[in-house]
């Protein structure tokens, strides 16, 4: 359970998701030595340039239709 937390920068806000639009789907880029981008669902206010703390860095969200 002692996985290190990973920081990621929001590169682009893709849209709202969830049954009532309560989540925002964003594309994030990992900070540090990893040069990867994934799509995540974020709850709460978020905009481009924000830094997120990801407790789980392997899980990727499904794309919006």
From Swiss-Prot:
SUPFAM superfamilies: Nucleic acid-binding proteins. GO terms for cellular component: cytosolic ribosome; cytosolic small ribosomal subunit. GO terms for biological process: cytoplasmic translation; maturation of SSU-rRNA; ribosomal small subunit assembly. Keywords: Ribonucleoprotein, Ribosomal protein. GO terms for molecular function: structural constituent of ribosome. The keyword Ribonucleoprotein applies. It comes from the Eukaryota. It holds the Pfam family Ribosomal_S28e. The keyword Ribonucleoprotein applies. CDD domains: S1_S28E (cd04457). Belongs to the eukaryotic ribosomal protein eS28 family. This is Small ribosomal subunit protein eS28. It comes from Drosophila melanogaster. The gene is RpS28b.
